[in-house]
């Protein structure tokens, strides 16, 4: 294994990841895994680029060296970030499924059981059908979930990056809270947040920060606008941070002016629900137990908001268009799997109350054997007052 120029994990950690993946491939009777998801390529090889809108794939045979396929404009990034020695660079105009199929034939995997990430947004129907046509003697099977299952529990180095991402997120949130004032625009708040995120060392994040105010705070995935803050507005902020592609996020709200009874009560409910959910979390606890603890606290308060969906999602390695690992593990009413030490979640008890606005309340937490550690600190959960 040849170390890349920028090595974010030890060779031993990469070797362990490859070995674990191959063990799972063997259990699933797969001879080779063709990987298209940027998170999974990064996890196994270290390779990263925001240019994954172009075709890229990592071919991992059960009993041979991996092969990486990339376009020419990304060629320099392979030795920069990845330990993969066999990289194949092809012209932009290449027939990428054909290239992939020919390499599978070359390494004598064309008549084997081939795993494809059938749940990945980066494996198009066209590519899948082309590979199926090119490899008539192969068994194409789903390889989705194999690498993801290993990503669930974070290693000590991964947790270190998560802590740093959380610190960056917290610094961005502090800057945002400080910037809120009557007459200030959402744009100006966003400028303060992003300046601090960049100065603190954040990379580009899987999703943008969400900064809204007043009635706009009811919009779940809306970003900042030119709207100016009015007296009596709730200003909602959900701020991410990213270090070496590992993410953390948190939500808070700021009330401008003298808060009324409804705002104070809603903030108390959201913060209580967040703490109750945290208190219920530790290794071995079923995910649905955590959901019930947090959601029942909200629902029984009769505040005008009901918690009906997941209360947390896994968070860690991410590239746009998302920062979460919710496709791997989410804490909801139907999830029976137990929590395990080393899992990281974005735990959310944010409430969007009609006529009031968004009560931002969320933290990134690390599950331990005895409980959870809150990674996003500095600004207390719930509503801040300006």
Regions found by a protein language model. Give the residues of each.
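Active-site neighborhoods and metal-handling regions in enzymes and metal-associated proteins
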Residues: 1-386
């Amino acid at each position: 294994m040849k170390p890349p120029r920028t090595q974010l994990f030890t060779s031993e950690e990469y070797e362990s990841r490859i070995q674990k993946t191959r063990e799972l491939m063997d259990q699933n009777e797969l001879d080779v895994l063709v990987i298209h998801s940027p998170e999974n390529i990064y996890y196994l090889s270290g390779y990263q680029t925001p240019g994954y809108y172009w075709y890229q794939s990592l071919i991992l045979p059960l009993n041979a060296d991996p092969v990486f396929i990339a376009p020419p404009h990304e060629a320099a990034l392979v030795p920069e970030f990845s330990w993969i020695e066999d990289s194949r660079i092809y012209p932009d105009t290449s027939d990428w499924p054909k290239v992939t199929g020919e390499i599978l034939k070359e390494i004598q995997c064309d008549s084997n059981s081939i795993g494809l990430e059938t749940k990945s947004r980066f494996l198009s129907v066209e590519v899948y059908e082309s590979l199926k046509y090119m490899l008539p003697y192969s068994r194409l099977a789903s390889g989705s979930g194999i690498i993801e299952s290993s990503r669930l529990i974070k290693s000590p180095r991964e947790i270190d990056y998560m802590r740093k991402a959380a610190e960056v997120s917290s610094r961005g949130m502090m800057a945002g809270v400080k910037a809120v004032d009557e007459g200030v625009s959402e744009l100006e708040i966003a400028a303060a947040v992003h300046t601090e995120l960049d100065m603190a060392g954040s990379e580009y994040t899987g999703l943008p920060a969400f900064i809204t105010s007043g009635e706009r705070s009811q919009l779940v995935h809306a970003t900042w606008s030119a709207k100016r803050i009015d007296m009596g507005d709730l200003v909602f902020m959900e701020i991410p941070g990213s270090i070496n592609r590992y993410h953390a996020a948190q939500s808070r709200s700021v009330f401008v002016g003298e808060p009324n009874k409804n705002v104070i009560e809603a903030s108390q409910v959201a913060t209580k629900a967040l703490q109750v959910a945290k208190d219920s979390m530790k290794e071995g606890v079923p995910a649905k137990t955590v959901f019930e603890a947090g959601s029942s606290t909200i629902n029984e308060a009769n505040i005008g908001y009901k918690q009906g969906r997941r209360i947390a999602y896994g968070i860690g390695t991410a590239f746009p268009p998302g920062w979460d690992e919710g496709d791997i593990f989410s804490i909801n009413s139907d999830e029976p799997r137990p929590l395990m030490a080393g899992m990281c979640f974005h735990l959310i008890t944010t409430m969007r109350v009609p006529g009031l606005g968004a009560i931002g309340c969320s933290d990134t937490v690390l599950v331990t054997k005895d409980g959870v550690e809150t990674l996003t600190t500095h600004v207390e959960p719930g509503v801040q007052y300006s």
